[in-house]
């Protein structure tokens, strides 16, 4: 049985979050939470909230046991990009892309 949680339109680049997603993929949920707690990145705080939500969804909606859960998927997909302009020399302007993400975590029950 799978339970998932998604945080949409999070104002952080997907590249930065996917770097941390790779660390927790396939880990037991308590181990993944410990890794996220001691990772000094903004993306880790976001992933921690989404993972806690996925765990709560698994326990409440499906009655799954927390000790049997592991992170089967952790991902950050592209969301809409805000475009801003930076003034440059000789009256020119360069674009600044402020990227955002859709962060998702799927937890599954470990098969024995």
Curated annotation (Swiss-Prot):
Signal peptide location: none
Disulphide linkage map: none
Gene Ontology cellular component terms for the protein in this record: cytosolic large ribosomal subunit
InterPro entries xrefs: Ribosomal_uL22, Ribosomal_uL22_bac/chlpt-type, Ribosomal_uL22_bac/org-type, Ribosomal_uL22_sf
Gene Ontology molecular function, alphabetical: rRNA binding; structural constituent of ribosome
Keywords on record: Ribonucleoprotein, Ribosomal protein, RNA-binding, rRNA-binding
One GO term of the biological process aspect: translation
Entry similarity comment: Belongs to the universal ribosomal protein uL22 family.
Role of this protein: This protein binds specifically to 23S rRNA; its binding is stimulated by other ribosomal proteins, e.g. L4, L17, and L20. It is important during the early stages of 50S assembly. It makes multiple contacts with different domains of the 23S rRNA in the assembled 50S subunit and ribosome.
NCBIfam families registered for this protein in UniProt: rplV_bact
Description of how the protein assembles with itself and partners: Part of the 50S ribosomal subunit.
Entry protein name: Large ribosomal subunit protein uL22
Organism per entry: Finegoldia magna (strain ATCC 29328 / DSM 20472 / WAL 2508) (Peptostreptococcus magnus)
């Amino acid at each position: 049985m799978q339970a998932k949680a998604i945080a949409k339109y999070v104002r952080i680049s997907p590249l930065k979050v996917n770097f941390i997603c790779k660390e927790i993929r396939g880990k037991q949920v308590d181990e993944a939470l410990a890794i996220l707690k001691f990772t000094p990145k903004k993306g880790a705080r976001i992933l921690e909230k989404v993972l806690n939500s996925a765990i709560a969804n698994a326990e409440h909606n499906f009655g799954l046991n927390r000790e049997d859960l592991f992170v089967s998927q952790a991902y950050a997909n592209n969301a809409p990009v805000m475009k801003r302009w930076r003034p440059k020399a000789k009256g020119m302007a360069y674009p600044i892309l402020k990227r955002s993400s859709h962060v998702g975590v799927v937890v599954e029950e470990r098969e024995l």
